[in-house]
Amino acid sequence: MPVLGLDNITGRIMRAGEGRILRRLQRIAAQVNSLEEEFKALTDEELQALTPEFTRRHADGESLDDLLPEAFATMREAARRTLGMRHFDVQLMGGAALHFGNIAEMQTGEGKTLVGTLPVYLNALTGKGVHLVTVNDYLAERDAEWMGRAYRFLGLTVGVIKSQSTPAERRAQYACDITYGTNTEFGFDYLRDNMAWSQDELVQRGHHFAIVDEADSILIDEARTPLIISGPADQPTQWYGAFAKLVTRMRGVRVQEEQFVTPADKDRLAHLRTTHDYEYDPKKRTVAILDRGVEYLQDQLGIESLYESEHTSLIGHLNNALKAKEHFRKDKDYVVVDGEVLIVDEHTGRILAGRRYNEGLHQAIEAKEAEEGTEAGVTVRNENQTLATITLQNFFRLYEKLAGMTGTAMTEAAEFHQIYQLNVVPIPSNRPMIRRDDPDQIYRTEEAKYAAILADIAERHETGQPILVGTTSVEKSELLSGLLRKQGIRHEVLNAKNHQREAQIVAQAGRRGAVTVATNMAGRGTDIMLGGNPEAMALAALPEDATPEDREAVLDRVGRAAAAEHEEVKELGGLYVLGTERHESRRIDNQLRGRSGRQGDPGASRFYLSLGDDLMRLFRAQVVERVMSMANVPDDVPIENKMVTRAIASAQSQLEQQHFESRKDVLKFDEVLNRQRTLIYAERRRVLAGEDLREQVRHFMDDTIEAYIRQETGEGFPEEWDLERLWGAFRQLYPVGITIEDLEDSVGGRPDLTVDDLVAAVTEDVHDRYARREAELGADALRDLERLVVLSVLDRKWREHLYEMDYLRDGIGLRWTLGREPIVEYEREGFDMFGAMTEAIKEESVGYVFNLDATGREGEGSALDRRPTDGLHFSAPTLDTAEGVVEGRFTTAPAGEPAEHDKAPPHRPGKSRNRRRRKR
């Protein structure tokens, strides 16, 4: 009997509960339906008066679950009156599923945007704010304006966070009952709030309830890489160019586990490793330097050992240069426009404007392009240092309640449950799906595959049937576009290079005779409607200064024409979706297919594959090749073979599992940092709230004095202690009043002196000096100074700690070679480093409290003069990028000129604990 994995068991349990959940949702829909006629009879004023009534009832103790039927009936009627749209029963079910904190899987075209209004209205009654999370600014603005008509009719306020919003605008939008925005904007505002220097700078007001649209894209695909706010780092750029040049002369061997299974294969691999400089795995997207490569680099760089501590940073440059060489291809992973390397989102094909890979990877790609010289003007830009970071998993887990909507969630149900404790509820479609999904056609060569694709497109185009062709990269979309031009077939191309026309192209993709070649359609956000999208087409036809009357007239005319064309296209078979190869994820394939057959319309789909496709090359294409050879299949004849289909499904399953493991790894490591971040951010909020820090600063003094003393007196007899050096350190910390002689006299001489005597005497002295400081400045002035000091020191030390943790994370994988578990080592060392950081915060805070003047400044260039929100970059995930994170520009309100360097008072002699630890 086969043993089931945890994911399979979890999946079975969840599927077993689906029927029970759906029956509950159907009962709720029936309750709402029973109220429909009663609510239809209400006047506008009576309907609008229900919102304050519901709010009062909830404040009096009635639960949201109890209010649900009436609130849903209210929103349904409001939507009918303001939007001309009535929620279907399945939409009521979807809304209830969201309210109960689930992922609602609803097919494309089922009206997910309208579904969201139900739980949003209900949960907004608490007054705590509801966040609607979308994949881009366009959808956030569109949905806030569109659905906002119903919310405002019922007396709720609606805000939208845009990438260019100022802090003041953001604060106003978050104060609304309902706030729309992208996942990155919500996440970055959380991080920026935890870099604020006063409560007036805070923009968010908590994390009560969030509904995530396109939940699989945001919660799954983007979860492998964290959000990061970074600032300039002191990193010399010459090494990027040097290593880009060096790796061009190095030979790599392609290594994949399944290629080296037998003993003979392993012997061959061992030999290959002696004749090559490095190895790389395109499936795992990893690189590893080999002995021969180490010797070559040491010779070229003129160093004895690449692995000496002073050369550690060179290993990072080497790894990035090799990754740039082997794993990042122009016009697939990135494009070069006007001398700038721009990342292409793997799943949507969009250019991620202003975004950059982090940790030196982007610079390595720039150096590669500059070295190859194929693109003029590419230069290596400066690297950035992490100032604040959080993964999307941990950000969304901040919410008291979380829900999501998507058309494709069941394939990731186990991950949603394991990472977010969210169940996936498949909501039935309002009309049955009648799209026909034809079997894959598999060819031996890419040439034969493209010939078949062109023939299929030409035949269907001749009839007028609209065709959507899905490709996996910019490169492939432009290749196919060139072939179509040669055939004389008019078409549109939607990829990263012309994303500005995206909405217009998608709006026309369902029209008669339309041929649209697009990179992955995940998260496009605009339905492909048969006959065209009348709203989008009307918008394109109107001038900017059109009057409302003009808009209504054009919309009416375009709507009637689109309705007639809709029926015509239905007769032709609806939208035909043609996939030019399988994606790494079955979910993305399903999203492409889901563009056809919306709301019961006819449609068809088919994928064309070849043995040269990326997915087939990664996973044992030789098995498929053998099958085709045995069957004597000519190049231009496709096969439909169960074994081949299983091999493709297995390849996708392996990659999905690999990405899942990668996301779990990210979460494991971030959990360590998350515990530390929670403590630091809670401390910041306490300081910002204006809590009296007097007792805390006194504790800082006590701990610092004791640490100084125990470090100096840890060995030897009292006569051997170097008290002169200890007192020198004290004098740099605070104006010492007690002398060594006074102390010795008080105990009868040096031999009788104990550590406890030292601690008690110096602690009493520092408390006395602190009281004098308070009398000199005044209590209020000292409290303000303490608040400024603690915030400044905490922020700077946290930034340094993040740098140290990045450094630790980069090298922790080497612990495998010592037989240690990397995550355990990372947690242990990270705990030690956090302890060292907190000690340093205490030490420096005490020094600043005693050594700064009453204004909190030591002169220009002081550490306290520096504002952490000046000149920052933000870093956000692409949709499932394989390496690193990406950075982008962020502009804030001006807050003074940043200082060149942070200065701390010169406390005890010797290196800081963090630096000592790291170089030990």
UniProtKB/Swiss-Prot annotation:
Binding-site residues, ATP: 91, 109-113, 527
Bias kind Basic and acidic residues: ranges: 859-870
One CC-aspect GO term: cytosol
UniProt EC number: 7.4.2.8
Family matches, as CDD domains: DEXDc_SecA, SF2_C_secA
Enzyme class, first EC level, given as a word: translocase
Location (main, coarse): membrane
Subcellular location(s) of the protein: Cell membrane; Cytoplasm
Catalysis performed (reactions): ATP + H2O + cellular proteinSide 1 = ADP + phosphate + cellular proteinSide 2
Pfam family name, one: SecA_DEAD
Organism, scientific name: Streptomyces avermitilis (strain ATCC 31267 / DSM 46492 / JCM 5070 / NBRC 14893 / NCIMB 12804 / NRRL 8165 / MA-4680)
Function: Part of the Sec protein translocase complex. Interacts with the SecYEG preprotein conducting channel. Has a central role in coupling the hydrolysis of ATP to the transfer of proteins into and across the cell membrane, serving as an ATP-driven molecular motor driving the stepwise translocation of polypeptide chains across the membrane.
One of the GO BP terms on file: protein import
Origin superkingdom: Bacteria
Quaternary structure note: Monomer and homodimer. Part of the essential Sec protein translocation apparatus which comprises SecA, SecYEG and auxiliary proteins SecDF. Other proteins may also be involved.
The name this protein goes by in its record: Protein translocase subunit SecA 2
SMART domains, A to Z: SecA_DEAD, SecA_PP_bind
